[in-house]
Curated annotation (Swiss-Prot):
<dbReference type="GO" id="GO:0047259">
    <property type="term" value="F:glucomannan 4-beta-mannosyltransferase activity"/>
</dbReference>
<comment type="similarity">
    <text>Belongs to the glycosyltransferase 2 family. Plant cellulose synthase-like A subfamily.</text>
</comment>
<feature type="active site">
    <location>
        <position position="159"/>
    </location>
</feature>
<keyword id="KW-1133">Transmembrane helix</keyword>
<feature type="transmembrane region" description="Helical">
    <location>
        <begin position="428"/>
        <end position="448"/>
    </location>
</feature>
<keyword id="KW-0328">Glycosyltransferase</keyword>
<dbReference type="InterPro" id="IPR029044">
    <property type="entry name" value="Nucleotide-diphossugar_trans"/>
</dbReference>
<dbReference type="GO" id="GO:0000139">
    <property type="term" value="C:Golgi membrane"/>
</dbReference>
<feature type="transmembrane region" description="Helical">
    <location>
        <begin position="56"/>
        <end position="76"/>
    </location>
</feature>
<dbReference type="InterPro" id="IPR001173">
    <property type="entry name" value="Glyco_trans_2-like"/>
</dbReference>
<feature type="transmembrane region" description="Helical">
    <location>
        <begin position="391"/>
        <end position="411"/>
    </location>
</feature>
<feature type="transmembrane region" description="Helical">
    <location>
        <begin position="530"/>
        <end position="550"/>
    </location>
</feature>
<keyword id="KW-0961">Cell wall biogenesis/degradation</keyword>
<feature type="active site">
    <location>
        <position position="312"/>
    </location>
</feature>
<keyword id="KW-0808">Transferase</keyword>
<keyword id="KW-0472">Membrane</keyword>
<feature type="transmembrane region" description="Helical">
    <location>
        <begin position="509"/>
        <end position="529"/>
    </location>
</feature>
Length: 556
């Protein structure tokens, strides 16, 4: 027997538990006798023998442990999705609209002399950074809101560094100022704190002290004229409510397949997560835009903080811990634009996945030590809101569907029950699809796309949990806008071949190759049709890997 194999057997005997050793040593000896002839034939035989033993005593136990963990996460996620769906069904059946649950009356303006004084002062904040393609739309929509001109201040928080963007914003503000709109263009000489820093700086101006509420819109959001008339009454008549959040409506959902997939995911977020949180717990995550805050509540919660990339969620959790309640109004929609380039969408998802994980790390003890909210709400915040929806869902989706399931074809000893591979995923997918009935025929594409994106979300989640690398990276989501969209897409088409290198995403290609290999192995040696899923999923990773998702704008 070669010294190499003797050393391996020594390690095996040394590391094996004593109770396990007596039973297994004879098995090893017998295995050695039967394979000793092969072992003596050369180093290849030794490597094969070592691989078999390592496979049995190292890889299989680890994989079985991972399968068990994934099964537990699958069950937790399934229960959470069913719970939210049941809540939404009861809300719809009982017709528990926000106007019925909370007091809501239109503002009385019958008395001409007192009409304007019945309207509270409202600050409208529009933070932006180098967004010349869409800034005119948001500023114009905010200035067209149906609200007395002397009871409204439009505040444009422009952190732009691009001279063309600055000039365009200033020109737009001047145009509306000449029409009698009380509009302020506030420019900082730095970008400290990014969006949170801009919003915080905007609240420090003296003229803000006269305002009771603040409405926030990102640069690509276009509220309807009656937005304030439909949301402010909730805050006027219900003093315990601090936030009114409205739904997003996507103006470019039909632009490409990727935007359709985003529409499906975000519709579910609003229909299920926001609706259930508002109805049962009077809490949900502020979406950062298309919402109205009570300024007193915002200040009591500590104002805007830039410790994470989800300053909106941070503020919402802190306000909740002070006892404030939120209301989600599903019927009030605010038009906005989805990111249509894969690069922009990846940056957005990194921020949306990394930030909540990092915030959970920072606020868990603060939530537990809080004395103003009930233990039930603390449990909801830590477990449902953060752990399941912001941590488990990302890690489980990637690890289970993109790593564990493909690996099971290489290790027949791994048994995954059908409820985890068929019943639970099917139920969750159907529940998600109900939020966007017009896209039911795209379910297969949505599943494959979400699995691809889960890789980036999982990576971002671990970065947030560990506070590593890009944990505080803030990249403004690129929006093409309607005015320049056709021009930019045409430019991308003409440079398709010369800019191909910009499209390549090596992580997607690596994962796609692994899943494709597992599919080929299952096709050759498996006894089922599981390879069909593996080939489809690998194709989805390949398509993302070569950048053929969404529109493409080459770097100049």
């Amino acid at each position: 027997m070669s010294p190499f194999l003797k050393f391996f057997l020594f390690l095996y005997d040394y590391l094996s538990p004593s109770s396990f050793f007596l039973v297994q040593r004879n098995t090893l000896g017998a295995s050695l006798d039967t394979t000793d002839g092969v072992v003596r034939s050369g180093i290849i035989g030794e490597i094969i023998y070592i691989w078999k033993q390592t496979r049995i005593f190292v890889f299989i136990p680890i994989l079985k442990c991972l399968v068990t963990i994934c099964l537990v996460m699958s069950l937790l996620l399934f229960i959470e999705r069913v719970y939210m769906s049941i809540v939404v069904v009861f809300v719809k059946l009982l017709r528990r609209t926000p106007e019925k649950v909370h007091k809501w009356e239109p503002i009385n303006d019958d008395d001409l002399e007192l009409a304007n004084t019945n309207y509270p002062m409202v600050l409208i904040q529009i933070p932006m950074y180098n967004e010349k393609e869409v800034c005119q739309l948001s500023i114009g929509a905010a200035c067209r809101l149906s609200w007395p001109l002397d009871r409204m201040i439009v505040q444009v928080l422009d952190d732009s560094t691009d001279p063309a963007s600055k000039e365009l914003v200033n020109a737009e503000c001047d145009k509306w100022a000449r029409k009698g709109i009380n509009i302020m263009s506030e420019i900082r000489d730095n970008r400290i704190g990014y969006k949170a820093g801009a919003l915080k700086a905007g609240m420090m101006h003296n003229y803000v002290k006269q305002c009771e509420f603040v409405a926030i819109f990102d640069a690509d959001f276009q509220p309807d004229p009656d937005f304030l008339e439909r949301t402010i009454p909730f805050l006027i008549h219900n003093h315990e409510i601090s936030l009114v959040q409205c739904r997003w409506k996507f103006v470019n959902a039909n632009e490409c397949l990727m935007t359709r997939m985003q529409e499906m995911s975000l519709n579910y977020h609003f229909v299920a997560e926001q609706e259930s949180g508002s109805s049962i717990h009077a809490f949900f995550g502020f979406n950062g835009t298309a919402g109205v805050w009570r300024i007193a509540a915002l200040n009591e919660a500590g104002g805007w903080k830039d410790r994470t990339t989800v300053e909106d969620m941070d503020l919402a959790v802190r306000a909740c811990l002070h006892g404030w309640k939120f209301v989600y109004v599903h019927d009030v929609e605010v038009k906005n634009e989805l990111p249509s380039t894969f690069k922009a969408y990846r940056f957005q998802q990194h921020r949306w996945s990394c930030g909540p994980a990092n915030l959970w790390r920072k606020m868990t003890m603060e939530i537990l030590q809080n004395k103003k909210v009930s233990a039930w709400k603390k449990l909801y915040l830590i477990y449902n809101f953060f752990f399941i929806r912001k941590i488990v869902v990302h890690i489980f989706t990637f690890v289970f569907y993109c790593l564990i399931l493909p690996t099971t074809v290489l290790f027949p000893e791994l048994q995954v029950p059908k409820w985890a591979t068929v019943y639970f995923p099917t139920t969750i997918t159907i529940l998600n699809a109900i939020a966007t009935p017009r896209s039911l025929h795209l379910l297969v594409f949505w599943i494959l796309f979400e699995n691809v994106m889960s890789m980036h979300r999982t990576k971002a989640t671990f970065i947030g949990l560990l506070e590593a690398g890009r944990v505080n990276e803030w990249v403004v989501t690129e929006k093409l806008g309607d005015t320049l969209k056709s021009k930019l897409i045409g430019k991308a088409t003409t440079k398709l071949y010369t800019r191909f290198g910009q499209r390549l995403n090596w992580r997607e290609l690596v994962v796609g190759l692994y899943i494709f290999f597992c599919g080929c192995y299952d096709f050759a040696y498996g006894g089922s049709y599981f390879y069909v899923y593996l080939f489809l999923q690998s194709c989805a990773f390949f398509v993302a890997g070569v950048g053929y998702i969404g529109t493409f704008v080459p770097t100049v």
